[in-house]
């Protein structure tokens, strides 16, 4: 496997009877910083802060979009991608609690709904990507 990004689709192919689920925040400044800062001079040149976070998020969201598109052909793969929460600027949804992980437009209160769904073979997998962040996330 030359492209580590193909791991998601590779797992879906190798384990077609398994239910796979992926969850990240779009507004990440931790994993995206690790992934892009040293490799993109235009990001490395900007001091840490809001401007750098915006550059990181632009690349991260684009990559998430490609990743989601790659998952779409696989019925055994679900995803849960809320915008973010104001808590350590990370991609992880399970740090400390599920607070602030809801996707309002999909009527999903928090990540717990996705986890429960992932474990229920009688339900189609949730595929939720937040597109309408209407308010800041004060509970995160």
Report residues per predicted region.
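C-terminal His-loop and adjacent cap/lid subdomain of alpha/beta-hydrolase
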Residues: 1-140
């Amino acid at each position: 496997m030359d492209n580590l990004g193909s791991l998601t689709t590779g797992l879906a192919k190798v384990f077609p009877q398994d239910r796979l689920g992926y969850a990240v925040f779009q507004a990440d400044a931790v994993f995206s910083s690790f992934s892009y800062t040293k490799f993109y001079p235009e990001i490395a040149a900007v001091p840490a802060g809001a401007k750098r976070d915006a550059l990181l998020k632009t690349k991260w969201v684009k990559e998430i979009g490609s990743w989601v598109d790659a998952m779409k052909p696989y019925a055994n793969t679900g995803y849960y991608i809320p915008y973010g929460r104001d808590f350590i600027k990370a991609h992880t949804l399970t740090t400390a609690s599920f607070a602030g992980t809801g996707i309002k437009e999909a009527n999903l209160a928090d990540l717990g709904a996705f986890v429960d769904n992932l474990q229920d073979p009688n339900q189609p997998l949730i595929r939720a990507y937040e597109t309408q962040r209407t308010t800041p996330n004060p509970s995160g």
